[in-house]
Amino acid sequence: MEKAKKKIAVYLFDIRNRNVGLGEFEWQLGSELARRAEELTMRHGIKFTFIVPRRFIGCFGNNVGYIAISSLSRCVIRYIPRYFDICHITHQMTKLKFMKHARVNLMTVHDINFMYEKSGRKLEQRKRKFAKALKRADELTYISQFVKTDVESHFDTSPKDGSVIYNGVTDLSAVHGDISRFGIADGYLFHISSLLPKKNVHKIVEMMRYLPDERLVVVGDLSTDYISGIKAKIAEWGLSNVTMLEHVSNEEKAELYRHCKAFLFPSLCEGFGLPPLEAMYLGKPVFLSTLTSLPEVGGANAYFFDNLNEENMALTVREGLADFYSHPTEAAEAVRRHAATFTWSHCADSYIQLYLKLLSR
């Protein structure tokens, strides 16, 4: 006799943009859950329904169900008369904060960067919205211990204890591409991100004044006023050792990691921080700020900027490169081992264990 169905809805609307962290998180989680869906139905009677953009109906196969939504319908879907045992809201910024007919609404919190990026009335508005979302959630998960501590220090999360489930990282070691169109020689320092101001990219650009024998390659969105300001500084200082690139493919990204000398990530606000771990998967040294979640994610095998003075940062890079490349084989293997502890398979397994725990209540 078939087990009674236990219905779990998972919000995956942001798979429409895999070039940002939320899109990649939702795509990888959805893929891993779909891969296990048939077994979970047989063993536990679980039936997944994925909430996705219409054009992604069917993209995770036939062992899961789908609800198609649009940007406009995200606010009203919470009221559809469909029962779910669990509705997993996969990040705190979505307009879908809960499902009215779900027995348990589970929300994953990725960061509260607005606490550091907003001020005045805008900050107070964001705080009220987030506090309301926390209150509506029956259970919480966080993508790092830092995020959990940060949220609990600013907001009332009682009586929910919450748990930490780390994101996975995609191993790009088997991904290959062609970067010849960029005309870049091997052995550069590398940074890739959204290039928002919080990524602190201007610091590593300014640092290059003190590393005239090194080259820096920066990849991301070059269309912002922030980047225009950085380009103006590059011209003012006459820096010829900084290259900025836009619109790289996943294959090109992997190749840019592969051919770099080191990865630099002096970010001010990170809930997790995928790019440093992507670089570590390819055996590269990473240089990180000591802020937010980066010490937690980078671990003992990362190098850290003790302060963000450009001259001191340059010294940290010089000393770190000398240390890493004094024993490159052993050092590369150590960072690979660390990165390999963050897998999407383990991430999905942790969420499944939580789903089973919530279903048993």
Short names for language-model regions:
Residues M1-R361:
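Carbohydrate transferase catalytic cores enriched for Leloir-type hexosyltransferases
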